[in-house]
Amino acid sequence: MKPSIILYKTLPDDLLHRLEAHFTVTQVPNLHPETVAQHAQAFASAQGLLGASETVNRALLEKMPALRAASTISVGYDNVEVDALTARKIVLMHTPAVLTETVADTVMALMLATARRVVDVAERVKAGEWTESIGPAWFGVDVHHKTLGIVGMGRIGMALAQRAHFGFTMPVLYHARRRHQEAEDRFNARYCDLDTLLQEADFVCVILPLTAETRHLFGATQFARMKSSAIFINAGRGPVVDENALIAALQNGEIYAAGLDVFEQEPLSVDSPLLNMSNVVAVPHIGSATHETRYNMMACAVDNLIDALQGKIEKNCVNPQAAG
């Protein structure tokens, strides 16, 4: 008899068939309490859980006593109570490698769009404001040869440094929990403390996961240390930044502009002051959102769950100690 799993994300037919070759699959729209209650027997017997963007917490795990592995279609897992999974010897699988290049492309796009005011001037053209040769009121600032400061030198940080160093001749500074010798050797990146990075960088790019240590890592003090000409990019997690402090820094001219893929509350409220600022490029958490990469993420998550329920957790496992 095949193990049973809960699938809470719509998959392409070929990936669904791959799952069904290994498991009895119950598809549900979400993990809300009413959904769990409606499918109580399926949740109670499920050994696997696969999906994205829903909260996986202790209350859910209480309804899933047979659960052995959870697979998230994402690299981040701040919506999952990992400690609760580990305590129950449930492994958590994620998809870190397949989205690296695409997210780095998004960060680079935010840097370019924000610096060159692409969104703002495009909207002005559409509004009929381009009636004569443009002047300084339409100008942006250069990206090439500017100093890039990367906060978080993981896979995505490395991919961004590669683009900046080789493609735009940008000196690279970085701050991370530990020095990254490969970044220093390949991109001549310079490790520095956060204050130094903030004071010297023309672009400050945040690519950090959300943890207790990184929550509101960027607040009024940090923005005050940045150049008034600096551009701030957040492509990590929204709550890493105190959004009210960011809004104040933009309104007061403490920093030049911001490109934001993530926010403290998502979706972003329609009455957020950020939406009325011409020096803000705001996009809806599109970091990995290409057709190709999202398919590859789903395929990776499917394979991760198949492997995990066969005891193979050598790669892409967040908490391998849970299998001990």
UniProtKB/Swiss-Prot annotation:
InterPro entries attached to this UniProt entry: D-isomer_2-hydroxyacid_DH, D-isomer_2_OHA_DH_cat_dom, D-isomer_DH_CS, D-isomer_DH_NAD-bd, Glyo/OHPyrv_Rdtase_B, NAD(P)-bd_dom_sf
Gene name of the record: ghrB
Residues annotated as signal peptide: none
Function: Catalyzes the NADPH-dependent reduction of glyoxylate and hydroxypyruvate into glycolate and glycerate, respectively.
Subunit structure: Homodimer.
PANTHER family: 2-HYDROXYACID DEHYDROGENASE-RELATED, GLYOXYLATE_HYDROXYPYRUVATE REDUCTASE B
Cellular location(s): Cytoplasm
Record's keyword annotation contains Disulfide bond: no
Active site per the UniProt annotation: R237, E266, H285
CC annotations in GO: cytosol; plasma membrane
Lineage: Bacteria, Pseudomonadati, Pseudomonadota, Gammaproteobacteria, Enterobacterales
Keyword terms: Cytoplasm, NAD, NADP, Oxidoreductase
Catalyzed reactions: glycolate + NADP(+) = glyoxylate + NADPH + H(+); (R)-glycerate + NAD(+) = 3-hydroxypyruvate + NADH + H(+); (R)-glycerate + NADP(+) = 3-hydroxypyruvate + NADPH + H(+)
Organism encoding this protein: Salmonella typhimurium (strain LT2 / SGSC1412 / ATCC 700720)
Protein name: Glyoxylate/hydroxypyruvate reductase B
Keyword ATP-binding assigned: no
Family from the record: Belongs to the D-isomer specific 2-hydroxyacid dehydrogenase family. GhrB subfamily.
SUPFAM superfamilies hit by this protein: Formate/glycerate dehydrogenase catalytic domain-like (SSF52283), NAD(P)-binding Rossmann-fold domains (SSF51735)
GO MF terms, alphabetically ordered: glyoxylate reductase (NADPH) activity; hydroxypyruvate reductase (NADH) activity; hydroxypyruvate reductase (NADPH) activity; hydroxypyruvate reductase [NAD(P)H] activity; NAD binding
Listed HAMAP family: 2_Hacid_dh_C_GhrB
EC number of this enzyme: 1.1.1.79, 1.1.1.81
